[in-house]
Every structure is written in structure tokens, then in C-alpha cells.
């Protein structure tokens, strides 16, 4: 029911995580974020007192795809072969160089997507991680059958993936303890596939998220991704957001510290990146985040979205559609009134 309303939470925040400093060279500024009650880093960069995003930090093992179809094997490629010390040393160095304590604070986001810690979830452009892992075991045990090899590969991969993700998070929390830390895109919930009328996470996905309790118990914030595709039907876009937020809230309630659920939301469509979400899609997705128990929205964008023309278009979009909707959400929160749009 697209017209349903609900009482919002007492505390809810909307954040701006777009590198709009890039627009300053074109004399385009986004000072109106303040009047729309959107929290942002004053310099318009990815890292500051309000929120800080770290892309592929440190030296995680990774099979980095190259344009010629081959891979750059970084830190031995897969976690079970990688050197954790080298990774953590590099991460510490990066934090010291680009994120000194004097500017630290707010939300700290680790964005690593070269593999997923659940072996089965390494599909499509991540399937190379499964292939390499299976090949390593096959070379060690050429007489084992396929099932034994895959089971052993999965066990080795997941055990080591946990070490890398867990120790990275603990290090961040230890040396930048003013931040509220979490991994971008977790918990993962592939909901809006055609043929899934409920849009809830399936039992297998929920079970796999439960297996990641070792990660979530250390996260201060849960950061599910709720980017939508233009090709989806309106109810599928709504369902994707609803399912992802509900799953993150379910995970949050498993822990005494109740990590906040802040959904990463992109103003462009995943499959049509030069097109902003329509006013209806913004309203529908924001509403779902709010009324299904979310604690906030992180509006995201990339430098690829920003040349002079795109900066001006984004500013116009913020002023006419995105900002006013965000303001209405925040007014409903502050006044404790139902959200009606």
C-alpha cells in the first residue's frame, strides 16, 4: 500500500556523502543542505567530521580485474593466502595520512567489495574468488571429489575472510574511536528479484546474515545499500528498500548495543546513472526507510556524477526535489507527526 503512513522514530538523520568539493572549481556550492536539515561535511568531501567513506582501504587480498580480461593479484589474491599484517599496516598508514585524529568523528564507512565473506555470495564479477579458492584446494588434493574440494575451499575462504574483515574493523574502532564504524552494503539482502512477491529476504540470505553475527556485533552502524534500478516496477523499488531495511533492523535487534541502521541511498538509478530518481521514487524509498525502522539515510554520489553541467543539475535537483522531500521527512521526525506524502 503506497499510501500507508506511520509514526517516525524520535531520532532520524539524513546525511550527504557526495564529493561536491569537486563542484567548487565550477563555482557551484551546496550550502542549501543546511536549510534542508541534511548533515554534511562542510568542505564537501568524502571524509570529515560528519561522515567519512574509505574506498577499498588498506591492502585487502583481491583479484582486481584489468581491462584486458586478466587480473591484478593483490596481496596474494584471496583472503586465505593474504598477509593480514601487510594489510593492517597499510590501513593504519592511510588513516594517519588522510584521516588524522583532529578531523575524525561522525560515521566511519569501510567500503570493500572485491569479495564477500560468505563464499556462496561470490557470484558474477566476484566468482573469480571461488574459482581461485577451489583451484588452490584441487592442486593440494587432486584425488578429492568435487564436493570435498568445494567444501574445503569454502571453509578456508570464510575463515580467513572473517579475520580480515574483523581485524580491519577492530583496528578502525581502536585508533579512530570517535567514529561510529560499519561496512558499506551489510547486511546484504537481494530482495527485489522478479518472482519474489513478498520482497523479504529469503531464508538462505537471512541465515547467511546470521552467520555474519561476528561482524555485526562489532559494527556501530549497519549500512545496507538501497540503490534502485530504473527498470524495476514501482512496487519492486519499494520492495527492495523495504526488504533491505527490515533485514538490517532484524539484525540490529539481535545485539544489545542496537547498531543504527543507516541506508546508503543513491540519487541516480543503478542501470541509468545519468537519470535522477523521480520525485515519486524519492518519496517512496525515503518513506520505506523511515517507517520500517531505519535510523537514517546516507545520500551517496560519485565524482563521475560531477562535471560543471552535472554539478549544476545536481544542485537544481537538490533544491527542487531531493531537499524539500528530505526536509519533510525531518519535520515529521521532529514534530512526531505521521509522514504524509
Swiss-Prot record:
May hydrolyze high molecular weight hyaluronic acid to produce small oligosaccharides. Its main location: secreted. GO terms for molecular function: hyalurononglucosaminidase activity. Expressed by the venom gland. InterPro entries: Aldolase_TIM, Glycoside_hydrolase_SF, Hyaluronidase, Venom_Hyaluronidase. It holds the Pfam family Glyco_hydro_56. Its EC number is 3.2.1.35. GO terms for cellular component: extracellular region. Keywords: Disulfide bond, Glycoprotein, Hydrolase, Secreted. Belongs to the glycosyl hydrolase 56 family. Glycans are attached at residues 3, 68, 83. GO terms for biological process: carbohydrate metabolic process; defense response; hyaluronan catabolic process. PANTHER family: HYALURONIDASE (PTHR11769:SF35). It catalyses: Random hydrolysis of (1->4)-linkages between N-acetyl-beta-D-glucosamine and D-glucuronate residues in hyaluronate. This is Hyaluronidase A. Disulfide bonds join 23-311, 189-201. It is found in: Secreted.
Amino acid at each position: 500500500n503506497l499510501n500507508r503512513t506511520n509514526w517516525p522514530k524520535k531520532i532520524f538523520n539524513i546525511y550527504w556523502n557526495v564529493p561536491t568539493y569537486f563542484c567548487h572549481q565550477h563555482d557551484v556550492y551546496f550550502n542549501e543542505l543546511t536549510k534542508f536539515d541534511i548533515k554534511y561535511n562542510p568542505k564537501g568531501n568524502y571524509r570529515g567530521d560528519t561522515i567519512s567513506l574509505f574506498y577499498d582501504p588498506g591492502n585487502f587480498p583481491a583479484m582486481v580485474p584489468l581491462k584486458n580480461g586478466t587480473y591484478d593479484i593483490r596481496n596474494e589474491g584471496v583472503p586465505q593466502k593474504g598477509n593480514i599484517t601487510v594489510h593492517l599496516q597499510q590501513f593504519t598508514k592511510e588513516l594517519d595520512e588522510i584521516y588524522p585524529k583532529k578531523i575524525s568523528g561522525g560515521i566511519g564507512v569501510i567500503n570493500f567489495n572485491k569479495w564477500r565473506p560468505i563464499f556462496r555470495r561470490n557470484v558474477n564479477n566476484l566468482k573469480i574468488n571461488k574459482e581461485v579458492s577451489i583451484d588452490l584446494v584441487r592442486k593440494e588434493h587432486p584425488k578429492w571429489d568435487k564436493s570435498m574440494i568445494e567444501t574445503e575451499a569454502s571453509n578456508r575462504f570464510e575463515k580467513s575472510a572473517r579475520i580480515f574483515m574483523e581485524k580491519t574493523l577492530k583496528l578502525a574502532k581502536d585508533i579512530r574511536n570517535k567514529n561510529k564504524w560499519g561496512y558499506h552494503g551489510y547486511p546484504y539482502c537481494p530482495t527485489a528479484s522478479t518472482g519474489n512477491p513478498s520482497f523479504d529476504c529469503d531464508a538462505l540470505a537471512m541465515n547467511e546474515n546470521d552467520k555474519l553475527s561476528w561482524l555485526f556485533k562489532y559494527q556501530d552502524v549497519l549500512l545496507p545499500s538501497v540503490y534502485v534500478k530504473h527498470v524495476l516496477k514501482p512496487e519492486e523499488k519499494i520492495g527492495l528498500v523495504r526488504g533491505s531495511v527490515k533485514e538490517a533492523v532484524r539484525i540490529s535487534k539481535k545485539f544489545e548495543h542496537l547498531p543504527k541502521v543507516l541506508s546508503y541511498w543513491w540519487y541516480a538509478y543503478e542501470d541509468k546513472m545519468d537519470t535522477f530518481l523521480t520525485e515519486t521514487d524519492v518519496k517512496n524509498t525515503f518513506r520505506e526507510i523511515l517507517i520500517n525502522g531505519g535510523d537514517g539515510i546516507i545520500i551517496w554520489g560519485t565524482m563521475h556524477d560531477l562535471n560543471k553541467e552535472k554539478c549544476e543539475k545536481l544542485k537544481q535537483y537538490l533544491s527542487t526535489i531531493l531537499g524539500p522531500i528530505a526536509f519533510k521527512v525531518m519535520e515529521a521526525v521532529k514534530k512526531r507527526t505521521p509522514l504524509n506524502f
